Amino acid sequence: MVTYGADSWTALGDPTRREIFERLVERPRAVGELARGLPVSRPAVSQHLKVLKAAGLVVDRPVGNRRIYQLNPDGVDALRAQLDRFWTRALAAYKAAAEQPTEEVG
């Protein structure tokens, strides 16, 4: 069972995983294609995909003898919802701070 939450943010905290995630935004890809141009090996890319999958951000499916990875819409939606909640709270806090009377110095 996949749970969506803080693990998503932790997973995307790694620059290589973020790059893999961004490549999957464009289209589904196999490990070899994802590894091309990255400063890590194919096995390392597989490990990064495992973390992204555990965080609920990607899913995979077999195609012949390869696995094709793509973004998991449910995981991406959950991540976006968390960001929306954070942004709403941050803007409300900023508004409240901006509306506070200021003390005059002098």
Task: Describe the predicted segments one by one.
Residues M1-Y4, A11, R23-G37, R42, ...:
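C-terminal regulatory/oligomerization modules of transcriptional regulators
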Residues P62-I68:
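Short, Lys/Arg-rich nucleic-acid/phosphate-binding segment
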Residues H48:
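Residues within the DNA-recognition helix of helix-turn-helix
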Residues R18-I20:
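Pre-recognition alpha-helix immediately N-terminal to the DNA-recognition helix
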